[in-house]
């Protein structure tokens, strides 16, 4: 199982939000490139980069920083989300060497977009489904849609996406533990990989996710916990790789 460190970018800095609220942020570093290098040195095989400003603006705002991280960390996979709502943005990131682009809001608001971009950019499209109580949130989590998370995941699987990143937004940034039941339910409902996100706080969460690897969970994204020290990244990675 992959353990994927999250680097959330706001105004060129590495931050974490609580439950997606832009006004409730904690700045962890003014140098996201150095942060990325730290996680790679600790053994990370993939990085999860989020352009938070882009997620709210609807277009990239931290692309320069993302490109710099790609150049500084050439030997790991990079997945990028936040503000990816057109083919031009996807092409730009792929040209810069990004491995996977994550589509969130646009996948929900314009479902045909997913089938178009999976055809145009096969093997590079991941869908980020952020949900509260089984319903999908959009626009940087500021709106809750009527869409059921499993129904949408099954549709995107049929469209040919690479994987689903599932975030339980009631848990994200709250250090409350991962929602194993909801993650397992989604993973069992589809045949493409699921990456868990939101609430991964301690080594116990890695153990719990390891028990549902057989359901189709291939990785876990962790953010606040590795910055605040409730999860030692190297220790968590070592455990994750046993699953």
Curated annotation (Swiss-Prot):
Pathway: Amino-acid biosynthesis; L-histidine biosynthesis; L-histidine from 5-phospho-alpha-D-ribose 1-diphosphate: step 4/9. It comes from the Bacteria. GO terms for biological process: L-histidine biosynthetic process; L-tryptophan biosynthetic process. The active site is at residues 8, 130. Its EC number is 5.3.1.16. Gene3D superfamilies: Aldolase class I (3.20.20.70). Coiled coil: none annotated. GO terms for molecular function: 1-(5-phosphoribosyl)-5-[(5-phosphoribosylamino)methylideneamino]imidazole-4-carboxamide isomerase activity. InterPro entries: Aldolase_TIM (IPR013785), His_biosynth (IPR006062), HisA_bact_arch (IPR006063), Isoase_HisA-like (IPR044524), Isoase_HisA-like_bact (IPR023016), RibuloseP-bd_barrel (IPR011060). Keywords: Amino-acid biosynthesis, Cytoplasm, Histidine biosynthesis, Isomerase. GO terms for cellular component: cytoplasm. It catalyses: 1-(5-phospho-beta-D-ribosyl)-5-[(5-phospho-beta-D-ribosylamino)methylideneamino]imidazole-4-carboxamide = 5-[(5-phospho-1-deoxy-D-ribulos-1-ylimino)methylamino]-1-(5-phospho-beta-D-ribosyl)imidazole-4-carboxamide. It is an enzyme of class 5 (isomerase). It is found in: Cytoplasm. Signal peptide: none annotated. Pfam families: His_biosynth. HAMAP family: HisA. Belongs to the HisA/HisF family. This is 1-(5-phosphoribosyl)-5-[(5-phosphoribosylamino)methylideneamino] imidazole-4-carboxamide isomerase. It comes from Methylococcus capsulatus (strain ATCC 33009 / NCIMB 11132 / Bath). The gene is hisA.
